[in-house]
Regions:
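Rossmann-like NAD(P) dinucleotide-binding subdomain of oxidoreductase/dehydrogenase enzymes
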Residues: 59-173
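Glycine-rich loop-to-alpha-helix module at the N-terminal edge of alpha/beta enzyme cores
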Residues: 1-57
Length: 173
């Protein structure tokens, strides 16, 4: 089911490409056509790609050579993945980071750049339209203090960051 929902999200993103491109262009100044053909199209392709991998995650039973002994791999989600994105191609970043997190069964908290937050907010709404469960994708807004609080939160299990070198240093503390 998860694969179908993430694939549906890719389709919904494609259906709303003009709207998403207009939002991103209004905030970062990149021409709408470039945003539509590059960022938004890549966002949908990334989601399609990760949706196709959902049924391929697994492990191997490794023979141990000892009677009655069993060795196995159990793939489990991390839990909550924080996704911090930059202002220049927010749609591309969201698709490339949220896609694998959802594909592996994680919940996501997206913290977009304060300079380009509208695409992430609309993405979260489109997640609901595509059928993702409530709470699977969340968006928090704010500056560095919000990002720092998110990264330091004990309920956040993994962090994916794209941004400046200085901001990266802050995130990695």
């Amino acid at each position: 089911r998860r694969g179908r929902v993430v694939a549906r999200l890719a389709s919904v993103i494609t259906d709303h490409a003009d709207e998403l491109a207009a939002l991103e262009s209004a905030e970062n100044g990149v021409p709408i056509d470039i945003v539509r053909r590059f960022s938004v199209a890549a966002e949908a392709r990334n989601l399609e790609y990760y949706a196709s991998w959902i049924d391929k995650f697994g492990g191997e039973v490794v023979p141990l050579g000892t009677a009655g002994a069993l060795d196995y791999t159990l793939p489990e989600p991390y839990g909550v993945v924080a996704v911090l994105t930059a202002y220049n191609t927010p749609s591309l970043f969201v698709g490339s980071k949220v896609g694998p997190a959802l594909a592996t069964g994680n919940a996501v908290v997206v913290k977009p750049s304060p300079l380009a937050s509208l695409p992430a907010l609309r993405f979260a709404e489109l997640c609901q339209e595509a059928g993702l469960p409530a709470g699977a994708v969340n968006v928090v807004l704010g500056g560095a203090e919000v990002g720092q609080a998110l990264v330091a939160h004990p309920g956040v299990d993994r962090v994916s960051f794209t941004g400046s070198r200085d901001a990266g240093r802050e995130v990695s503390r």
